[in-house]
């Protein structure tokens, strides 16, 4: 039922003219909850090691990708870490990224957290190193997020190879005329 709802949403996006779509798989939502050992305590083929934990997210993405035109990009936002020693690691994220690449993912949007009460040290660009690690391990265009409110920082992160794109949300709320 959940997979069908996602594929129907993809079909609606195509019908109304979206140019690209992104599956939100971070911050404790469904995909993130499967990937994280903090949330996924299953003892069947969908739990345990990262290969099993990423099984449903890959099944879901594949069905969504099949419903989306090949010529249009489709990406996934996922955690590069849970910010918890017992949680999803950056190596797990890289493993997931490589598997997504194999099933036709066009870009990644790398974030972190949501499955634990951990409070990481935050500051401008604090998650960019996660995007860089996944980008360099997978060779897939990757987006960085996390308090990137200054256009000079955004340019620096792209120029130094940390990412290919910057995701902006609050930055545009703070400064709607962001250059």
Residue ranges and their predicted role:
Residues 1-179:
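Flavin-dependent oxidoreductase catalytic cores
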């Amino acid at each position: 039922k959940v997979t069908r709802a996602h594929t129907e949403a993809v079909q609606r996006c195509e019908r109304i003219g979206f140019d690209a779509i992104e599956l939100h798989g971070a911050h404790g939502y469904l995909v993130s909850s499967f990937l994280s050992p903090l949330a996924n305590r299953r003892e069947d083929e969908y739990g345990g090691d990262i290969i099993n934990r990423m099984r449903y997210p890959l099944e879901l993405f594949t069905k969504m990708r099949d419903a989306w035109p090949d010529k249009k990009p489709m990406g996934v936002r996922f955690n590069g870490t849970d910010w918890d020693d017992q949680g999803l690691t950056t190596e797990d994220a890289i493993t997931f990224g490589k598997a997504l690449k194999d099933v036709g993912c066009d870009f990644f949007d790398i974030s972190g957290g949501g499955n634990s009460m951990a409070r990481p040290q935050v500051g401008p660009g604090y998650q960019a190193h996660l995007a860089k690690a996944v980008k360099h391990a997978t060779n897939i265009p990757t987006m960085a997020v996390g308090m990137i409110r200054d256009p000079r920082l955004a340019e620096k992160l792209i120029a130094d190879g940390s990412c290919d794109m910057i995701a902006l949300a609050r930055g545009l709320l703070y400064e709607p005329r962001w250059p």
